[in-house]
Amino acid sequence: AVEKINQANIKTVVLQSGEENFEEAFICDLIIKIKKINPQMAVTLSLGEQNYKNLQNWKNAGADRYLLRIESSTKNHYEYLHHKRNIETRLECLKNLQELKYQTGSGIMTGLPKQNIKMIVDDILFFNENKFQMLGIGPFIPHHQTEFANQPKGTAKLALKTIIATRILNPYALIPATTALGSLDKDYRSQALLCGANVLMPNFTPQQQKSQYEIYPNKKCINENFTKTSQNTFSELEKLAKDANMVLDFSRGDALN
């Protein structure tokens, strides 16, 4: 998959998974192999909460960025969403990432159960205070195998308004037009770009494995196929950008803040 990304002249790759008990050396090996394919390629990890030693070893192996959403900066709400966890651990992990000089990303879902507007405002202020380089914002979409299965999904309107407010306070941040915004009743990613998002994220995971990572139903990227590079590979992404009066940029996209 990374070789396909490199062939497509993309200079950044994200390795994402659930919070597994990874062998630290396995991730190090992946990072080293990616850097051998292209030493200039930025490697972003999204592997959940990890201890300081793992984060340090992955940084030393060549990782450049790390994504770890706060989900809610309100303590009681965070611990309602994440049973048997406390927000202090998440905050410590974010602090460790910044200390280790990762370009650090965080973010939230909008429309979460028991979330209110004040919480979202506090989250936006939390982003601003911590000067994160990347901020992911998308609507909550319930999965039928979770305790929130019967909760209503978040709206595109609330997610887009949150992106606008976040962009105003964080003018240099990388803000993706998230896959979740493309997975509602229609594709809202162009609207997200118009509201302040500036990143699109094609999924190069092989089709067979991609279908096993259904974190919410009807995930947009499940049916997108970027495994064969051709001049039409990015036609959909080019259209999304064009609809927002933008053009695609395939550089590393290093943060400006």
Where are these regions (language model features)?
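Auxiliary Fe-S-binding modules of radical SAM enzymes
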Residues: N128-N257
